[in-house]
């Protein structure tokens, strides 16, 4: 991230001020063009504000064509084999004194989908140009999944009663990617229709895939079903985007700046830093949720149970999502009435004697036993039993 003076002022799209840009112009039919440009934005809006403004009569007509275009782009992306997994992010509201006032999950607004499709198209166009001319840059690559991982995913989903496509007798990486895309669509459809496994089943699909990363060569992006992909649209937020901008401008004859000397090392470094930043973000979410849960229990009482969903399991216990945004750990030692063992697929925990079973995606009622706010850890116990 650039210093705030640059990222929030000099390089930021401030309303009614000129800013230097690089434009990707993409006609519905024909090749894209790339050029330096100047932009003067009229407003700085959050996605929520943009969503509300879209209903204004003067804006409806202007966005109607854009909506149709981006909807078509989205449909074509899924038709060519892009993954269809929805993972709503947790949003926080703070009280102005450093405390967390509330947290909620929000489905993707229309304004976000519109911007997302245009950014994907721009990123693809730039990557296609650089790749076709064998230019060095930092590509965003997502390699095809390991066939054995997809075979295991199919077995897990079948064991959980989730409809899956028939698996080919032999899976190559290419067919594994196609099966993964098909599975992602079926899982999301099943979750919407049944209301079961809302958190657990999409997570199973994601964990069966390889991680996206940066690489100096174009290896394609399986998740987006893109032949070539890069990060181009956020040069004030991500360093790889800045490298791509420089590569594009050099290719267009608008800059003489050479590419970095060690692109391979830079790709590894930026990929590592991205994962580290994601881990910090996850920890920050856990800490905020721990404090919010403690405040919530202070008001409602610790004896009031939560409805939850089993979203993960290991031999020593269950991971539960509850209260929509909170997550906690239910140790197996707190499961009473039997001795429970994890099955070979890691999809269920069954009692040796009575046969009582806990499965991924099952509902479960829990009580909070302990919160370690400094670590964001929550320990749970079972308030009621899942189905037998």
What is the predicted function of each stretch?
Residues 1-388:
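Conserved, carboxylate-rich catalytic/transport cores that coordinate ions
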């Amino acid at each position: 991230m650039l210093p705030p003076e640059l990222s929030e002022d000099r390089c930021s799209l401030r309303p009614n001020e000129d800013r230097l840009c690089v434009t990707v112009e993409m006609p519905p039919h024909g090749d894209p063009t790339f050029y330096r440009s100047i932009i003067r934005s009229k407003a700085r809006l959050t996605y929520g504000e943009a969503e509300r403004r879209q209903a204004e009569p003067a804006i409806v007509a202007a966005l109607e064509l854009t909506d149709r275009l981006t909807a078509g782009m989205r449909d074509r992306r899924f038709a060519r084999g892009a993954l269809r997994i929805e993972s709503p992010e947790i949003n926080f509201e703070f009280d102005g004194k450093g405390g967390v006032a509330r947290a909620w999950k929000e489905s993707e607004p229309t304004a976000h989908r519109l911007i997302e499709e245009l950014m994907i198209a721009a990123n693809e166009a730039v990557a296609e140009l650089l790749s076709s001319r064998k230019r060095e840059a930092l590509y965003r690559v997502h390699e095809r999944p390991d066939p054995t991982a997809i075979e295991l995913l199919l077995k897990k989903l079948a064991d959980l009663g989730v409809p899956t496509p028939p698996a080919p007798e032999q899976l190559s990486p290419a067919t594994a990617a196609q099966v993964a895309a098909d599975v992602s669509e079926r899982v999301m459809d099943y979750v919407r229709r049944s209301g079961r496994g809302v958190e657990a089943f999409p997570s199973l699909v994601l964990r069966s895939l390889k991680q996206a990363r940066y690489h100096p060569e174009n290896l394609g992006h399986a998740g987006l079903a893109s032949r070539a992909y890069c990060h181009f649209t956020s040069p004030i937020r991500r360093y790889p985007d800045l490298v791509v901008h420089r590569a594009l401008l050099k290719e267009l004859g608008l800059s003489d700046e050479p590419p970095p000397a060690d692109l391979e090392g830079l790709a590894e470094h930026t990929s590592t830093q991205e994962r580290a930043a994601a881990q910090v973000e996850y920890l920050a979410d856990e800490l905020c949720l721990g404090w919010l849960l403690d405040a919530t229990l202070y008001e409602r009482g610790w004896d009031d149970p939560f409805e939850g969903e089993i979203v993960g399991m290991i031999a020593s216990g269950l991971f539960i999502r509850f209260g929509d945004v909170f997550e906690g750990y239910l140790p197996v030692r707190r499961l009473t009435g039997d001795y429970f063992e994890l099955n070979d697929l890691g999809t269920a925990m069954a009692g040796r004697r009575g046969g009582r079973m806990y499965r991924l995606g099952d509902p479960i009622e829990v009580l909070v036993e302990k919160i370690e706010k400094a670590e964001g850890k929550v320990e749970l116990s079972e308030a009621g039993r899942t189905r037998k």
